[in-house]
């Protein structure tokens, strides 16, 4: 799992697998 910006804004960090 990698924590990265999953939003267009790139201001939010979510859990992306």
From Swiss-Prot:
It is found in: Secreted. Residues 1-3 are annotated as: Interaction with thrombin active site. InterPro entries: Hirudin, Hirudin/antistatin, Prot_inh_hirudin. It holds the Pfam family Hirudin. Its main location: secreted. Keywords: Protease inhibitor, Secreted, Serine protease inhibitor, Sulfation. GO terms for molecular function: serine-type endopeptidase inhibitor activity. Hirudin is a potent thrombin-specific protease inhibitor. It forms a stable non-covalent complex with alpha-thrombin, thereby abolishing its ability to cleave fibrinogen. Belongs to the protease inhibitor I14 (hirudin) family. This is Hirudin-1A. It comes from Hirudo medicinalis (Medicinal leech).
């Amino acid at each position: 799992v990698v924590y990265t910006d999953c939003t267009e804004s790139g201001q939010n960090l979510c859990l992306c697998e």
